[in-house]
Design a protein with these regions (language model features):
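Fe-S-dependent hydro-lyases/dehydratases of central metabolism
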Residues: 1-886
Length: 887
């Protein structure tokens, strides 16, 4: 093996045969270091190439090439620190707005120092796609797309003007306007070219994204994953991310999916399988390999990769192959050049070649997958389609209930044109009130959308209808879907069942389901009814889809249409009729389910590479509302102190280009601010839902003169820290176990003198800060699961929380906590917040912080109100030396 001292990356530069493209040869580098590339997982090879290519820059060393090259000796089970330098960054408007606010605030700070603000400029290309703000206000109408687009523009005028300013102020940030599509689908269909040109070299496409579903790009052989705003900001400034070389779990796929089984059924099966895998895959790479991969289209692979965060993995990676190249060509891009490049780099997979070595290798026969749904509260809770009714009945039977059947008051159309007339109807347990074809997981898959359209066509031709009161919507991930559904003659049949295109964005999947008919909402709020939603999304956490809908089931787009017709989830659609035709005859699911041959033939007739090119060329200018939007200009943003959307954040007060690192301090006499349950999501910690007038953020905004009708959502106001701080732990379904029986942002405040009092978390945190009392949060298993929401770390940090003590952490949120200076501390095995018998009256000391090492120990002392105390050792989840530098 070559001595690292002798390694010069320039010596491995070659020219790709038949082209003028130069590249850094990974096989040549591997030969120099004695690395057997064939044994190294495909997902690690682009990372190894990036380390080797960057030796001598930003502290990257040849020793790190050696370290990752020896991965096969330990399969990721040893804590080896390596750098990852992403080639580009993607983000959406909710996560990207705070990032641009941070860059704008840094420019303002630099200007106050008398320096050129333009020195604050991202060094890595970043694309921000506006996709998270369109709401399903109006659905089921030919005017829905226009109405929702106009409402989106009006509600977000100030925020969109700020983003437009950012596009002209920062050379390396591109803003992709609203109504273009969902960031991950736009990335897959347009932004990704299969490779990058960096410093005049052809390199593998690598990225990070400020959204947990960034791994959807893994389907195209792109190494990338979701991070929070803190890590993304550093990457945009060209800094490598330091990470531990991961374990890589291989999933060998064999066989093919059976007739009538969809990619959605497959990904729900994989999600269940990997969540039940001993040890889990949190913080690990999952790599799909084997002959079965050849039987999955690129969009099917994208559906699987998209749900990596739901099964817990950092990535769900498919190596680049002929299918990847074919997809690039089918969507209007060059596929031959990337394929030649990946073959030259030994990064392309060919069926039949020996498998690399993995930390563990699992097998899945695609022929064993069955029609499935997941719910009612977690994406990993897969169930066979036939069990849907049984599972709903079990969920509805929980708790002390008195189920009601309510007659809903008939309703006329409203003057604003949002709600259609609603005749009198009964509302009971299991009734579906939302049926949404939504989310990048499935709307990026033409086969699934065409299947939904074919099912709608058959149902429509039979005279079947969706019951009144079911809010139906179709929100494709890009306008390309509208093009092929229209060409196939299927959009008209979806329209007939109420699945009109209502927006291009994340919509219902991120909680932007919009209001239900007022009489429906009133019935759900005032009576004991457990209603349901069915959606083709990737998450169904409680309170996420709609605050009044308690059960939510994930399923494929054609099944969403079928269940909308059925109108209730308390049914076995495999044996019971889902409705009647125009003559009153029973119709079963099998009668209208399209065959694989029908789907394939329709795709061949309506899919066209030219449509992809033209759609994006025509849409990148944005709708008229975007083109006509006035915005500031210049390198420095003119902050408006009265703005309720965009505020200069206080992090950069006293900003210096040479900020000294403070020593870490031990913590004494801390109080518990919140005690969380298992599976506390970032939605629980920092919700993005509609702002209720009686909530702390709502009351604050009203006090600032904002009208109740203009409160909008917490997601839209992420650029205003005054609002966001009042929302922390404020999800209406979140439970603070310090106060059993309560939900939302309330806690028990224990003053240094006097009796405890119940108050908002924001007010309690403010009082603790005034007293000089540190605070901690206790959690359970998988603390911080869900979206890569930086405010779920920013918020607690700004409230004064010094440490989160939990049984386990999800990867992205743990990294965000570190980036915000909040210690993630892990309880010993078999010790839980419940076994510690905590109630909030205790105080806590944390010692060993001042001498902390990566994955070191911190001593926790619990002082109880009765004078007793207890000590135990916690594991610091500061995993790397670079994380220790951040904290």
């Amino acid at each position: 093996m070559t001595s690292p001292i002798d390694f010069d990356p320039a010596r491995s530069i070659k020219t790709l045969p038949g082209t003028a493209h130069r590249y850094h040869s990974l096989p040549d580098t591997a030969a120099l270091f004695g690395i057997n590339l064939d044994e190294l997982p495909f997902s690690l090879r682009p990372i190894l190439e990036g380390i080797a290519r960057n030796v001598g820059q930003n502290g990257v060393t040849a020793e790190q090439v050696q370290a990752l090259g020896r991965w096969t000796e330990h399969q990721g089970t040893q804590p080896i620190e390596i750098p990852f330098t992403a080639g580009r960054v993607i983000m959406h408007d909710l996560s990207g707005t705070p990032a641009i606010v941070d860059f704008a605030a840094m420019r303002s700070a630099v200007q106050r120092m008398g320096m050129d603000p333009a020195i604050i400029e991202p060094l890595v290309r970043a694309d921000l796609v506006i996709d998270h703000s369109v709401t399903m206000d109006n659905t089921g109408s030919p005017a829905s797309l226009r109405i929702n687009g106009e409402l989106e523009a009006a509600r977000n005028r100030e925020r969109y003007a700020f983003l437009k300013w950012g596009a002209q102020a920062f050379k390396t940030i591109r803003i992709i306007p609203p109504q273009t599509g969902i960031v991950h689908q736009v990335n897959l269909e347009y932004l990704a070219q299969g490779y990058l040109n960096i410093n005049e070299l052809m390199v593998p496409d690598t990225l990070i994204g400020m959204d947990s579903h960034t791994p959807m790009a893994n389907a195209l052989g792109i190494v990338g994953w979701g991070v929070g705003g803190i890590e993304a900001g550093a990457s945009m400034l060209g800094q490598p991310m330091q990470m531990l070389a991961p374990e890589v779990v291989g999933v060998e796929l064999t066989g093919a999916l059976r007739e009538g089984v969809t990619a959605t059924d497959l990904v729900l099966t994989i999600t269940e399988m990997l969540r039940n895998y001993p040890g889990g895959v949190v913080g690990k790479f999952v790599e799909y390999i084997g002959e079965g991969c050849a039987n999955l289209s690129l969009p099917d692979r994208a559906t699987i990769a998209n749900m990596s965060p739901e099964y817990g993995a950092t990535m769900g990676f498919f190596p680049f192959d002929e299918i990847s190249a074919g997809y690039l060509k089918a969507t209007g891009r060059d596929g031959d050049l990337p394929l030649a490049f990946y073959k030259a780099q030994n990064m392309a997979w060919t069926p039949g070649q020996p498998l690399p070595r993995y930390t563990d290798l699992l097998q899945l026969d695609l022929a064993t997958v069955e029609p499935s749904v997941a719910g009612p509260k977690r994406p990993q809770d897969r169930l066979p389609l036939a069990e849907l009714g049984n599972v709903f009945r079990k969920a509805a039977a929980e708790g002390d209930r008195n189920p009601e059947v309510v007659t809903v008051t008939p309703m006329k159309a409203d003057d604003a044109g949002i709600f259609a007339p609603l005749p009198e109807r009964e509302l009971k347990d299991g009734d579906i009130v939302i049926a949404a074809i939504t989310a990048c997981t499935n709307t990026s898959n033409p086969g699934l959308l065409i299947a939904a359209g074919l099912l709608a066509k058959k149902a429509n031709e039979l005279g079947m209808k969706v019951p009144d009161g079911v809010k139906t919507s179709l929100a494709p991930g890009s306008p390309v879907a509208t093009d092929f559904l229209t060409k196939a003659g299927l959009q008209q049949h979806l329209d007939a069942l109420g699945f009109n295109t209502a927006g291009y964005g994340c919509t219902t999947c991120v909680g932007n389901s919009g209001p239900l008919a007022p009489s429906i909402e009133a019935a759900l709020q005032n009576h004991d009814i457990i209603a349901a939603s069915v959606l083709s999304g990737n998450r169904n956490f409680e309170g996420r889809v709609h605050p009044d809908v308690d059960t939510n089931f994930l399923m494929s787009p054609p099944l969403v249409v079928a269940m909308a017709i059925a109108g209730n989830v308390n049914i076995d659609v495999t044996t019971q009729p889902i409705g009647q035709d125009a003559s009153g005859n029973d119709v079963f699911l099998k009668d209208i389910w399209p065959s694989n041959a029908e789907i394939t033939q329709t795709m061949q007739e309506c899919m066209d590479p030219k449509a992809f090119r033209e759609t994006y060329e025509n849409s990148l200018d944005g709708p008229e509302t975007w083109q006509n939007l006035a915005s500031p200009t210049g390198p420095v943003y003119d902050w408006d102190p009265d703005s309720t959307y965009i505020q200069e954040i206080s992090f950069f007060d006293g900003f210096s280009l040479e900020t000294p690192k403070d020593a870490l301090d031990n913590i004494a006499g801390a109080r518990m601010l919140v005690m969380c349950d298992d599976n506390t999501t970032t939605d629980h910690i920092s919700p993005v839902s509609r702002i209720r007038p009686d909530s702390p953020p709502g009351e604050y905004l009203i006090s600032q003169g904002v009208a109740v009708d203009d409160l909008t959502s917490l997601g839209a106001r992420r650029g205003n820290h005054h609002v966001m701080l009042r929302s922390i732990f404020g999800n209406g379904k979140a439970r603070n176990l310090m106060l059993p029986g309560t939900t939302g942002a309330v806690t028990s405040y224990h003053p240094s003198a006097g009796e405890p009092a119940q108050m908002s978390i924001y007010d309690a945190a403010a009082r603790y800060r005034e007293e000089g009392t540190s605070t901690v949060v206790f959690g359970g298993k998988l603390y911080g699961t869900g979206s890569s929401r930086d405010w779920a770390a920013k918020g607690p940090a700004l409230l004064g929380v010094r440490a989160i003590i939990a049984e386990s952490f999800e990867r992205i949120h743990k990294s965000n906590l570190v980036g915000m200076g909040v210690l993630p501390l892990q309880l010993p095995q078999r010790v839980t917040r419940a076994s510690l018998n905590l109630d909030g009256s205790e105080t806590f000391d944390l010692n060993g912080i001042d001498t902390l090492e990566p994955r070191g120990s911190v001593e926790l002392t619990i002082h109880r109100a009765d004078g007793s105390s207890q000590q135990l050792e916690l594991l610091s989840r500061i995993d790397t030396s670079s994380e220790l530098d951040q904290i």
